[in-house]
């Protein structure tokens, strides 16, 4: 996270524009039993994004953090979620193109209305 963001920022600061989007998970804002390593890494990434947003915003670089609290429709999900078909029928699995549309929206935001953090989850997800 940090190294990728730093390298992207080096190129963007020369151009005085750009967008860096970090992807997190529910663990970015809430720890859970058995998830200490994952949660600490995701919370750390969120802190990196916050710091970079404050540092790079004045240089016209939009830094955002996206929390994905969902199963995204991939082959791995299809193979490993026994209730995949049922969840898919009721919009309980996120479609990758819908996820991508949210990233494009972040990218296209005008500077006077930048979003720092976006939570994406299906309607049925418990939070």
Which residues fall in each region the model found?
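Residue-level signal for alpha-helix termini/capping positions
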Residues: 13-14, 28, 57, 111
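Amphipathic alpha-helical dimer-interface segment in Rossmann-like NAD(P)H-dependent oxidoreductases
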Residues: 1-14
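C-terminal helical subdomain
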Residues: 58-61, 65-70, 85-127
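Generic structural signal for well-ordered alpha-helical scaffold segments
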Residues: 9, 53, 104-107
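Short beta-loop-alpha junction of Rossmann-like oxidoreductase domains
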Residues: 34, 61, 65-80
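Catalytic loop of short-chain dehydrogenase/reductase
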Residues: 19-44, 49-50, 54-58, 72
